[in-house]
Amino acid sequence: MLKRLKEKSNDEIVQNTINKRINFIFGVIVFIFAVLVLRLGYLQIAQGSHYKQIIKNDENITVNESVPRGRILDRNGKVLVDNASKMAITYTRGRKTTQSEMLDTAEKLSKLIKMDTKKITERDKKDFWIQLHPKKAKAMMTKEQAMLADGSIKQDQYDKQLLSKIGKSQLDELSSKDLQVLAIFREMNAGTVLDPQMIKNEDVSEKEYAAVSQQLSKLPGVNTSMDWDRKYPYGDTLRGIFGDVSTPAEGIPKELTEHYLSKGYSRNDRVGKSYLEYQYEDVLRGKKKEMKYTTDKSGKVTSSEVLNPGARGQDLKLTIDIDLQKEVEALLDKQIKKLRSQGAKDMDNAMMVVQNPKNGDILALSGKQINKSGKMTDYDIGTFTSQFAVGSSVKGGTLLAGYQNKAIKVGETMVDEPLHFQGGLTKRSYFNKNGHVTINDKQALMHSSNVYMFKTALKLAGDPYYSGMALPSDISSPAQKLRRGLNQVGLGVKTGIDLPNETRGQIEPLTNNPGNYLDLSIGQYDTYTPLQLSQYVSTIANDGYRIQPHIGLTIHESTNKDEVGPLKKKINGTVLNKVNNTEKEIKQIQEGFKMAFNDKDGTGYVSFKDTVVPTAGKTGTAEVFQNGEPRVNSTYIGYAPIDDPKLAFSIVYTNQPVPPPWLTGGDLGRDVINYYFKQLGKDDKNKDKDK
């Protein structure tokens, strides 16, 4: 009896222990479920919208697509740069698209279009051979696979050795059909996920376009669309000034990557690379087309929707008058041939800039480079990117600097005579090599007196000329004063034109070479651009106000039609500075320029005496060397009409013969003035008829 009671008591103890453990386990389970319920509630209530957005993003992705750029027009609305539409085949890679799936699509597409295989590299072929023959590639690398497995070599070393083992025999296995597939496949791989990549946009035939369009449902990621190229209705005219746009394959050029990525561009965006296309990129670029792509769980694109059709870029109207531009080019071409026939066989550059002196509008600019045989190539950009010694054209600036620093007075007379310095150095004027002629400042400009400028420079240095004198030893301070005066009219400083790569010329230090200081005063030391010369003479014509030149005129909203859209912005030429001279001093320079072109003793009289409107200006000749042989640069600057200037110009011819024959380079300026004002008169008459 006691034994049974004892056994029963032990059973109860065991049962109680089991019950307690079961209760503990149930408690833990209940606690875990409670935590899970709370966590689930938190996810659904507090974080529900967040995860819904993630799911949504996985399913719907917005992608921007390129649109055509804005047009470039001349000041009268004539289209200079436009867009030419062309058919294109594109590919958009899905988020989870595999290489084998892309290859399958490429194989299907290769049966519908013909690709140019010239861009395929040897490395492309090797990679593709591995893609097509993975087992053969593996069999070539038995030893290396073991080394890769035990860590003896790294993956990049393995890959490098594999590529080195693939030779001509393997690459010869690739058929012409394989190369067609490869040409497509390499373009597919060039793009990023959900970023449309151009497969073919050159010479897409209507047959190809239609065939692909009909098979789109069987070609995942492939689409047919329209691409564009820039077209130039006036051919090569101003082609260099317009600049270039990158191709779809090129995207953002490497040297401009940081510049454009910082502005939110994508790497495969087509962008302006140079000159106007680059300068006005923000204006000419369009508003991208926005597409929404829907993907399934595997990441494949199942549908697309246009969220925003986008718009082509805004139109840019230029200050250029294309009719005047064409005339300047034709006259420059004619003048070059004429000068060569007169003996200028080594002339290698000829350039002209035409502008409105009062508002900075560039009306025309043309440059030509000439080789030994006389063949000419366009070099319009040279008008502001290349610099030359320009000679006596700068003398108006020298006199203004002399007035500013009280070195000379308006109307002051000096004797033009050979200057003899200590050490045997002699300097003289071209028009008066041995005589003694008393002239004033206006006459100095008319005759282009070197001596008057030398004496002005010496007075500026505090050392008036006397025969046998030693030149000043330290001319750093007077050189700075002289250059400051030249800078004020636009010589030796950038003009500020709205184009990249402008040069300010070559401005070398001047400290202990007084001979160079004297040469500076007559345009024989520092070098300047044709555009700087144009700004300089415009400053004289504009009563001392230096205006920033500009080639952009107005910006207009784009429209779906051919006409120019509503005005969005006017581009004005701002006043950069006014020369630090009195009205009387400026008038004196203007009078000297008038005499240079209209007095029978003036250096420009032969060419400019009979222009249809009175013209003022200055000529220049700079001594230079070409391949060690002495040559001269010839320059001409001017403006018209004298009383109310509407046009200013500069002309530069480089490396003409020495001693110079009588060359009629100034005739180009005369012919342009006559054309412009005759045409202006016709336009005014037509306007009167329309009233």
Residue ranges, per PLM feature:
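Short, small/polar residue-rich loop motifs at catalytic or cofactor-binding pockets
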Residues: N64-P68, K288, K345-N349
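N-terminal leader/targeting segments and the immediately adjacent pre-domain N-terminus
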Residues: V212, L276-K289, Y293, V301-K338, ...
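Short, basic/aromatic recognition patches
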Residues: K52-N64, L324-A344
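Membrane-proximal periplasmic segments of bacterial cell-envelope enzymes
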Residues: M1-D282, M291-V301, A457, Q480-R484
